[in-house]
């Protein structure tokens, strides 16, 4: 079988489980053959050998079981860069790029800015921020040692030196350190949310946060005052139906200038507020 026929066959198979079957099929073939996408188009008639076909069949089997492409290939693009991922980390999503966009609007690239990320996972957010803000000092926390190993691997890949990765249950290991900005894409899915059925390959602890999905966010907002400088800003990603609850939690904890930002689909996705004594 040549590459062109393989793409067509896989596209038809994957159509049953994916809304982007052509893209998925190309990525799997690129992975099995260890080639670029341009190679697929310039070598359509190139035959796939037996060893490559066996690997491709194995990859296809995983995709047909609804395993995300990112876990199959072990990598995912975020903020125009490639990051390693594993089943110990969440897959970075485009919505989370809002955190970077809004943070960059609030910072001065020439100043030394201290930034804290809570729940860094594969490190995509902190590393992307560190690359954009060369003078920043970023601290990235996660409770998962396995996730931090992936984050450190990504830091090495992108030659990052201004991110400090720390194993910590939220703020626990920070002592009295304070930051100009705190940001997080925390767990915010409800315990029995039906959407979890489609996320069964991803780490549950990084997704679910209590019956209403707000346990982690409550903790983050209530305790941020001990680790943020006066006038500092806290930015939190959340579910599209959680805006009112997030505003209530911020107000209960006396935060100022509470603002919600919508994602590209027009859903409330990020809320930020300023701490002022």
Mark where each language-model region is.
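Conserved Class I SAM-dependent methyltransferase catalytic core
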Residues: 212-274
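Conserved AdoMet
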Residues: 31-105
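Residue-level signal for inorganic ion chemistry
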Residues: 28, 66, 96, 125, ...
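Conserved SAM-binding loop
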Residues: 140, 209, 235
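Conserved hydrophobic residues forming the short capping helix/wall of the S-adenosyl-L-methionine
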Residues: 14, 107, 155, 224, ...
């Amino acid at each position: 079988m040549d590459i062109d026929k393989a793409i067509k066959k896989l596209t038809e198979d994957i159509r049953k489980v994916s809304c982007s079957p052509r893209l998925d099929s190309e990525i799997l073939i690129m992975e099995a053959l260890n080639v670029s996408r341009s190679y697929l188009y310039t070598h359509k008639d190139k035959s796939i050998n037996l060893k490559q076909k066996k690997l491709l069949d194995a990859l296809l089997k995983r995709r047909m079981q609804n395993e995300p492409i990112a876990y199959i290939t072990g990598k995912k693009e975020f903020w125009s860069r490639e990051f390693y991922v594993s089943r110990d980390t969440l897959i970075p999503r485009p919505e989370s790029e809002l955190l970077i966009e809004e943070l960059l609007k609030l910072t001065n690239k020439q100043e030394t800015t201290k930034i804290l990320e809570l729940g860094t996972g594969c490190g995509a957010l902190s590393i992307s921020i560190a690359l954009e803000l060369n003078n920043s000092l970023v601290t990235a926390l996660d409770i998962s040692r396995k996730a931090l190993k992936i984050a450190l691997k990504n830091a090495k890949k992108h030659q990052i030196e201004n991110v400090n990765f720390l194993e910590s249950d939220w703020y626990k290991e920070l002592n009295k350190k304070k930051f100009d900005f705190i940001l997080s894409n925390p767990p915010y899915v409800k315990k029995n949310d039906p959407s979890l059925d489609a996320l069964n390959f991803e780490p549950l602890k990084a997704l679910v946060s209590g019956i209403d999905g707000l346990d982690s966010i409550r903790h983050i907002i209530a305790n941020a005052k001990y680790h943020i400088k006066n006038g500092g800003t806290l930015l939190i990603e959340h579910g599209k139906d959680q805006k009112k609850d997030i505003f209530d939690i911020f107000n209960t904890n006396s935060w100022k200038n509470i603002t919600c930002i919508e994602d590209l689909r027009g859903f409330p996705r990020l809320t930020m507020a300023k701490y002022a004594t």
